[in-house]
């Protein structure tokens, strides 16, 4: 950490919490293009060129601020098709360069806090917990004994000014915050960053680092209430939560604390020790062993927290209270539920025998076949009721490329839904993709499916017998299972780190 600070010359800047001067350091832009805070950052020759010269950066920022005050808008307009050149330079190109460097600078205070937190602690070298599938064993272990869940949709992005005010807790440098305001005014699409897929796709190609930083910070602020509650109550302490960057208190714009004065008066509402929280992207789940009254209090508390701290109206319908015993949880593409499994026990006492009816809770994960067919329909693999269709967009490819694309798609789906308790839904998806592949090939060769398969043989579609299906037999070949038990086995993989939209699959 000392080497990191010395390389970035942070000791002097940190004396007054200044990070704005780092924007004028040329190696920041080399670091931005290196795409990481831990790749080649200690090399003496960072590999940057004279395009990121200090003089250019100073002139552009000065001109940016002047234009902002004179014309009341950014002159670096993304939608400006003319792309005028000022100061002898392409302003759109250099504004993008400053944007990328600024994203690195804004990450530094958080990165230093993380390094400080990890100092003296043993790092976990395993990356297994990065997998999305690692959530489901946790749900199976913890949620089986819970009664109610809060199904939470994190509210839409807040006003940019509120975001800046919230960021002041972590970043004390006023100059950097002013520059952040300029960038947020330049990109008004921030308000649709989370809710509209087109905006996410747009930012994935341009300014990805900066907007992912804002998105993660935005969501992290919503989650920080749970860490705050844990610190205030001994009932809510949890070892796993110490990985969060913790806040001490929450503030309004006016100079008074929101929760600390009246906190003891309302803390009794949440003395339930069995609380479990998981989140993926904009959807979160809070489970409790308590009653519906307790969950209603949690819902009321979260709504009031969002409204008082973020100055925004959060609709109550974004939080749903569901009972696990009679509700399926739609999370991460699976339908998860807790059902009672009846169990009959025979007890023998001397000459008498008794039948004891018992029931145990079991956590089920199922593949939502209706949702999957709708996704395949949107991607033009089948019609709305699940009848396979040809894929015209792929008909121009070679036969091997067409087969490989369909095979790769099914392999990915079977890989992800290997945790489904019943495989019949997955077999139906396999049928749709196999026949869609055959119809695409027949369309390309201007033939019917029957004539095409008769000419080339049905063995052509055996390519769809993927290694995923062989895993079941290779894994459990030494264990005695009936066919029904093997059919219901679940496998969770530890290499799945993201979910892509099927409609955008190419």
UniProtKB/Swiss-Prot annotation:
It is found in: Plastid, Chloroplast. One of its GO terms (molecular function) is RNA binding. One of its GO terms (cellular component) is chloroplast. InterPro entries: Domain_X, Maturase_MatK, Maturase_MatK_N. GO terms for biological process: mRNA processing; RNA splicing; tRNA processing. Its main location: plastid. Keywords: Chloroplast, mRNA processing, Plastid, RNA-binding, tRNA processing. Belongs to the intron maturase 2 family. MatK subfamily. HAMAP family: MatK. Usually encoded in the trnK tRNA gene intron. Probably assists in splicing its own and other chloroplast group II introns. This is Maturase K.
